[in-house]
């Protein structure tokens, strides 16, 4: 039985096109990988330890320094109960930073969604050493109350 073979003619022009296309895909992949690595290495991630008052609560903080030497803070929490369900009940959660030079500073209110998660993105000119969340009745207070929900360990940002 005779089998026929059919060969596809490959021209030099076709080989060049495939080579350029392959190199372009490799270049795009490498540029994407480098960008992800560079952007990821510029930020510092802090994870809150387990809280004795809210053991199910989990939280992470991502810090970046911008060109003006301000600290971009991206805080995310999940499994955090509505503050009205606490004992004693509170109205809101407030995020604080401790700094070496400026003491404790109120960063703002942390809003909790129906699925028990929340986030706060803000900037601070002050270098934080610790970040913590308290349950409060007034989000604009100047000093934290006694009910600390989550507290990071001390850290050192560059």
Language model features with spans:
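Sec-dependent bacterial lipoprotein signal peptides
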Residues: 1-42
């Amino acid at each position: 039985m005779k089998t026929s073979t059919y060969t596809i003619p490959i021209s030099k022009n076709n080989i060049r096109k495939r080579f350029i296309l392959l190199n372009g895909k490799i270049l795009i992949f490498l540029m994407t990988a480098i960008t992800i690595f560079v952007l990821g290495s510029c930020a510092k991630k802090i994870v809150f330890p387990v809280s004795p008052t809210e053991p199910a609560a989990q939280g992470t903080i991502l810090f970046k320094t911008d060109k003006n030497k301000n600290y971009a803070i991206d805080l995310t929490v999940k499994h955090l109960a509505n503050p009205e369900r606490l004992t004693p009940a509170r109205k809101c959660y407030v995020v604080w930073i401790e700094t070496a030079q400026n003491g404790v500073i109120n960063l703002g209110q942390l809003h909790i969604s129906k699925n028990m998660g929340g986030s706060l993105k803000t900037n601070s000119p002050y270098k934080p050493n610790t970040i913590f969340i308290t349950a409060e009745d007034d989000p604009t207070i100047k000093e934290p109350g006694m009910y600390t929900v989550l507290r990071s360990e001390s850290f050192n940002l560059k």
